[in-house]
Amino acid sequence: FSVNVTGTFIESVKAATEFQITSPSDNGLVAAGYIDIKWNNPVGGSASKYNVYVDGNYVNSTTSTTYEYYTTSVAYHTAWIEAELSNGAKEYTKTVKFGVSKKGLAVNDNMGRRLDPVAMNMGWYYTWGTTPFSYTTYGSVEFVPMIWGTGSENAISRIASSGYKYLLAYNEPDMPMYDTNGNFVGGSNVDVNTAISHWYKFAGKSYHLGAPAPALCPAWDSGTWFRTFMDSDLVDKSTIDFIPLHCYYGTYGGAEGANTFLKEVVDATYNMYHKPIWITEFAVSGWGYSTASNRKQVEA
């Protein structure tokens, strides 16, 4: 006998997620330094290992679905992953293209809400604080928290557990908070012996740690705070991954001034400690914008 069945049958089938790189995003921009390349599980089975390729070259293998790749090459790069499956087959992600930028943004809330860091090709930003902006324009830009002074040290454990890749330490500890007229000048005013005795609080965490950022270049005669800090046997230099520098020249020096800055500040500090250098603040000091000459300096 036969049975006729009429009606509509709907079968719900869950589509397999494509094996792909999830970070960096294709045609996205990331900060130079340590870059997390992430991907999801392959579709065809479990993987015994993953082979990571950057710019067409094999760089390493891992059993994890993330790999930390280091580059300071400001350019567009490519990445793809080869999965070696337990059944002997292989599976490949599509190639993603991503840009690497050294440019960062030091910005407070009043200015930050008015800026679009993506349009400015910024790879990262900081706010002199411990929490990122909630503005959507900053959602894809890496935030780097800062322990501005001893008063914010209680945020270190939260920062470490939140997965931030970097931490900036004390901001201009070699400068006072206020000048003799009571004007705020930005220094956290941390005694160097206090900084030395507190350094253990920063060390040994999952982030890459920056040294305290001095207002006065370590290579200058006046840079005694930083040299004292780094010369202390109580500071394990292996815990310091990079050195942030600030520099404010008194006058605009054009190309010659820029070359002097690179030679006498950046190169000189690197030659002292052989640590990567981050320039986290620089400008001519004068701040005025009322004359054509001042505007030229600021715009330069």
Language-model regions: role of each:
Residues T127, N171, F226-T260, V266, ...:
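Aromatic- and acid-rich polysaccharide-binding/catalytic face
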